[in-house]
Each structure stands twice: as C-alpha cells, then as structure tokens.
Amino acid sequence: MKLGVTVLSVALLVAALCPPALSAPMGSDPPTACCFSYTLRKLPRHFVIDYFETTSLCSQPAVVFQTKKGRQVCANPSESWVQEYVDDLELN
C-alpha cells in the first residue's frame, strides 16, 4: 500500500514539473513558450529562481516558473500563491 502511494506521489510530482510545450507561429518568428495546462500543486518557494509570463500569442495566459534544476513549470496567474511568488521575485 505504501509503495503504491509513493509511486503515485512521484508520478504526480514528475508530471507537475514537466516543462511547458512549445508552439511556433507560422512564419520566421522564433518559437513561443506556451502552456496548455497548469501545475496542480503549489511549488516550494525555495525551488523557484525566476519566472516569465507567456505572450498573447498563446491560447491561455500563464506564469512559467524556472526551478533551481532548470525545469520550467506552468502556473495559473490568477492563483494567489503564483501572484505572491511573482511579487517576491520582482522585489529580489
């Protein structure tokens, strides 16, 4: 039972920390990072070192956090913890 819960927890964590998908508009413009889903869990603040917001070319708005390990995680910009992290990163 404990092994199954551990495996499920690890699988959910890996899925939450997957990098966002890339989509490229037609033409010679460089690729644009877009998010098609958001992380379901709040990231530990000490994992996050930077962020950027997706452009208006993307179908849905997102904040993309970069972790210490170089992963990019899509987050919902309307969630309070996301806004708090963005404010904190702007101040530092």
From Swiss-Prot:
Record-level GO cellular component terms: extracellular space
Signal peptide: 1-23
Molecular function as annotated in GO: CCR chemokine receptor binding; chemokine activity
InterPro entries given in the database record: Chemokine_b/g/d, Chemokine_CC_CS, Chemokine_IL8-like_dom, Interleukin_8-like_sf
A biological-process GO annotation: chemokine-mediated signaling pathway
PROSITE patterns: SMALL_CYTOKINES_CC
Keyword terms, alphabetized: Chemotaxis, Cytokine, Disulfide bond, Inflammatory response, Secreted, Signal
Task performed by this protein: Monokine with inflammatory and chemokinetic properties.
Protein name: C-C motif chemokine 4
Natural source organism: Oryctolagus cuniculus (Rabbit)
Gene: CCL4
